[in-house]
């Protein structure tokens, strides 16, 4: 869950273990502050790209493609990781699970990204590596889904066509 889930998923798992009369973690400012602190301390500065991401992203941008980032992490964490990799300027908007659009696999964040560029879902595609990414792409009705995976057998869902898999 920690690798494929969002902070919201982790919080929900912890909440289920707590006494029912305890303040929900989503409403607990102390918990929220501690999670922000831990994210800054442990996550920031530890971005590890899946191969050379800068070259293809720069090529897409130079060719006129508009690129957005949709993550189940926080916007702050995503922006910091992109900045660390030197590619933050390629993404607009950067949408996180904390942006008010819900998390993947819900389609709302992806639909917001598409609308931010004045496009329709059928004119967009999503590149991702998780079931949540694939689910968001399907729910939003984008034209296609490109999967980044170690191999065709490692794609997040069997409905992802093998020809849509780009090896890491």
In which residue ranges do the predicted regions lie?
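Conserved Lys-Pro-Asp/Glu-containing loop-to-beta segment of HAD-superfamily phosphomonoesterases
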Residues: 104-134
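A metal-dependent, Asp-based hydrolase signature
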Residues: 1-40, 51-54, 59
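Conserved H-loop
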Residues: 88-92, 120
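Short, acidic loop-to-helix structural element flanking the phosphoryl-transfer center
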Residues: 4-8, 40-69, 75, 79, ...
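Acidic, Mg2+-coordinating phosphoryl-transfer loop and its flanking beta/alpha structural elements
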Residues: 125-165
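Glycine/Thr-rich beta-alpha phosphate-binding loop at enzyme active sites
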Residues: 93-103
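Phosphate- and divalent-cation-binding pockets in alpha/beta enzyme and binding domains
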Residues: 77-80, 112, 136
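Surface-exposed amphipathic alpha-helices with a cationic face
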Residues: 54-62, 114-115, 134-139
């Amino acid at each position: 869950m920690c690798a494929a889930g969002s902070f919201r998923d982790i919080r929900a798992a912890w909440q289920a273990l707590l006494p029912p009369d305890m303040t929900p973690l989503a409403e607990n400012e102390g918990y929220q502050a501690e999670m922000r602190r831990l994210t800054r301390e442990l996550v920031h500065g530890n971005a590890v790209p899946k191969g050379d991401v800068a070259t293809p992203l720069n090529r897409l941008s130079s060719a006129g493609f508009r690129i957005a980032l949709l993550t189940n992490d926080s916007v702050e964490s995503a922006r910091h990781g992109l900045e660390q990799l030197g590619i933050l300027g390629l993404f607009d908007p950067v949408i996180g699970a904390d942006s008010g659009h819900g998390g993947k696999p819900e389609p709302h964040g992806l639909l917001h990204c598409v609308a931010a560029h004045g496009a329709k879902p059928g004119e967009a595609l999503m590149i991702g590596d998780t079931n949540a990414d694939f689910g968001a792409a399907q729910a939003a009705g984008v034209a296609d889904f490109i999967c980044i995976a170690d191999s065709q057998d490692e794609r997040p869902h069997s409905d992802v066509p093998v020809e849509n898999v780009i090896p890491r």
